[in-house]
């Protein structure tokens, strides 16, 4: 019976997927017809009114067709073909003229689906209409973008995540409306904001107010789900399945996210609590909003600001301050740094920073950048993801290497490795004070994660962080990746400067040509 149900679910999934593909195809056909109609009309120097008279169709209807919103019936297409002096088959053909071919390829690819145009106030049909009026040069540019996307295997996942990162940076990674929603939530449900917030009090709201069932047992029945943190099964009584192996901080964080989805009335969301299942921009954005809400709920704004003020007021660097604050709120290191990043510009004027999260696995020397926010700075770590040879002098990578060596297969998932560095980017005047925390991942003892926040060193930082020049803080020259770095005495180098040598060779050739 169980296998039969699974087969039915798979069939339903295929039907839904095919229906979505069919809808996309229909939209594509409508847009192509609109482009062709507009081009043919303009080639014949006809206004919409003139074409309306010739075809006996209304101006408004023709306008809807050209915008890709309507697809006329066969007899109306025949009227249009006769009015334009073209064959019926030529008008309905999906083949476009040479200058419009790149637009057809753009529509036929999944690139436009990756771009969250609606979130930036851009209407897809208007965008296509503008492109149809473009010059041959712009058409060539579109074709180039498509080729670049194909050659670099640009994925929807990368596109959406890049769009989200830019969205956060545009808003300075701070959202007052979410902050106010959290304050209202605390008042409405009469919660005590003093840390740590009670797990039972928050789950009680989910159960009583939103009719949830919380299940921490069923996960053990499926070994395939061990890497996931939680799954929501929607229904009249939603069931939240939580991975029982999560830490208390991780569980309450998920509870906070579920409260956010319900309280903020967010419906377009992923039901799986895992970054592996966040591919569309809407899911990514709403996941970020719910995570922001949960973090702001668990790390109370006023109390957290007071704790950070005390931390920044210290004359000497002391890693215990960070550990104590994390433990006080029963938070994860990422929640701590995320909250600090959200508030740093608004509260302390520290609005120039790098936020980085790296993952690594035992037995490898690979470090993957899995989350990044860069605010008002020149450095671009994520722009070099292809090589993976990030500078091994970064504090986030340095402490990952140390914790891997220290544990060496030992299960010590609560242990935190804290680091700090005063760094200067090679051949620039850009300096940073960076803090980082690394931990063994709670669901896999062979996997490790570090989170780092690096503030740009300027007069504002010097006025706020009193221990910035503590001699105990090591100073290091760093770079982006080994591929573009010409430091000759770097003991941490993981790769030869291959890219830099190619660039230098090209420059040498150019200089030689100029001397001829």
Show which residues each predicted segment covers:
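Short juxta-domain linker segments that transition from a proline/glycine-rich
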Residues: 10, 25-32, 39, 43, ...
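Short, intrinsically disordered or compositionally biased N-terminal tails of bacterial proteins
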Residues: 1-24
């Amino acid at each position: 019976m169980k296998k039969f149900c699974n087969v039915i679910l798979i069939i339903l999934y295929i039907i839904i997927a095919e229906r979505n593909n069919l809808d996309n195809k229909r939209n594509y056909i409508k847009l192509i017809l609109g482009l062709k109609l507009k081009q043919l009309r303009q080639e014949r120097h006809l206004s919409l009114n003139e074409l309306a008279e010739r075809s006996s169709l209304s101006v408004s209807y023709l306008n809807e067709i050209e915008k890709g919103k309507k697809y006329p019936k066969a007899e109306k297409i025949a009227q249009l073909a006769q009015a334009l002096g073209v064959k019926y088959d030529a008008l309905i053909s999906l083949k476009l003229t040479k200058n419009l071919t790149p637009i057809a390829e753009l529509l036929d690819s999944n690139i436009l689906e990756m771009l969250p145009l609606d979130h930036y106030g851009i209407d897809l049909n208007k965008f296509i209409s503008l492109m149809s009026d473009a010059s041959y040069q712009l058409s060539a540019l579109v074709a180039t973008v498509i080729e670049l996307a194909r050659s670099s295997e640009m994925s929807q996942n990368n596109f959406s995540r890049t769009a989200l990162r830019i969205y956060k940076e545009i808003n300075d990674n701070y959202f007052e409306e979410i902050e106010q929603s959290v304050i209202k939530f605390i008042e409405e449900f009469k919660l005590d904001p003093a840390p740590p917030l009670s797990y039972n009090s928050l789950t009680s709201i989910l159960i009583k107010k939103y009719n949830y069932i919380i299940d921490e047992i069923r996960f053990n029945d499926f070994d395939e789900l061990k890497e996931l943190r939680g799954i929501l099964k929607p229904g009249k009584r939603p069931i939240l399945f939580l991975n029982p192996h999560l830490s208390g901080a991780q569980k309450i964080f998920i509870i906070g996210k579920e409260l956010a989805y319900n309280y903020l009335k967010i419906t377009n969301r992923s039901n799986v609590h895992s970054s592996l299942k966040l591919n569309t921009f809407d899911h990514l954005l709403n996941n970020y909003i719910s995570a922001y809400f949960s973090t702001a709920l668990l790390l109370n704004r006023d109390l957290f600001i007071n704790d950070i003020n005390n931390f920044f007021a210290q004359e000497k660097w002391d890693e215990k301050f960070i550990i104590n604050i994390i433990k006080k709120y029963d938070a994860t290191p990422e929640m701590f740094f995320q909250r600090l990043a959200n508030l740093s510009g608004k509260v302390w004027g520290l609005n120039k920073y790098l936020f980085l999260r790296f993952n690594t696995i035992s037995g490898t020397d690979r470090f993957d950048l899995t989350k990044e926010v860069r605010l008002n700075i020149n450095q671009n770590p994520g722009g070099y993801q292809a090589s993976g040879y990030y500078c091994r002098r970064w504090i986030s990578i340095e402490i990952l290497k140390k914790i891997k060596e220290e544990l060496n297969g030992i299960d010590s998932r609560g242990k935190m490795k804290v680091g700090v560095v005063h760094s200067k980017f090679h051949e620039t005047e850009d300096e940073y004070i960076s803090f980082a925390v690394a931990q063994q991942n709670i669901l896999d003892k062979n996997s490790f994660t570090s989170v780092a926040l690096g503030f740009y060193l300027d007069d504002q930082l010097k006025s706020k962080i009193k221990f910035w020049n503590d001699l105990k803080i090591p100073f290091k020259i760093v770079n982006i990746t080994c591929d573009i770095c010409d430091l000759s005495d770097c003991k941490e180098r993981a790769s030869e400067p291959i890219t830099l040598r190619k660039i230098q060779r090209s420059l040498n050739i150019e200089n030689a040509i100029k001397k001829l």
